[in-house]
Amino acid sequence: MQNILLLNGPNLNMLGKREPHIYGDQTLLEIEQRLKQQAIKQGYNLLCFQANGEEAIINRIHQAFGNIDFIIINPAAFTHTSIAIRDALLAVAIPFIEVHLSNICSRESFRHHSYFSDISQGIICGLGPKGYDYALDFAISSLK
């Protein structure tokens, strides 16, 4: 069974509580449970990880080397700041797709730049929690 890793960055543990008018009212746990069920139905294993700190995310990416076939990542605020996470993704050379709940291009100007978009397989943004479903579908299609 192939493994897909769902990585979520800072403050995403607050989904459902934090600015629901921007991020929706679903919790991260609800999203993860739904995606795990979808993955299992199609014969894939989905592992989920969320951290508020850059070091923990980098360490999890390093641990993925040789064990994970595809990464779905919502780097959250690290999208616009983390060269270190970018370098970790390049180091492990695991294909990945970038996901954002909100449309980062229509928000504050400091959110318009992503350190990941040019090295990702694609970007899904602005589609709310459904964006994760589309990302999982893409990951599975890529692995078939």
Curated annotation (Swiss-Prot):
UniProt KW Transcription regulation keyword: no
Entry's EC annotation: 4.2.1.10
Highest taxon of source: Bacteria
Gene3D superfamilies according to UniProt: Dehydroquinase, class II (3.40.50.9100)
PROSITE patterns (UniProt xref): DEHYDROQUINASE_II (PS01029)
Transition state stabilizer, annotated site positions: R18
An example molecular function term from Gene Ontology annotations: 3-dehydroquinate dehydratase activity
Family of this protein: Belongs to the type-II 3-dehydroquinase family.
Database matches in PANTHER family: CATABOLIC 3-DEHYDROQUINASE
HAMAP family with a match to the protein in the record: AroQ
Protein name: 3-dehydroquinate dehydratase
Native source organism of the sequence: Haemophilus ducreyi (strain 35000HP / ATCC 700724)
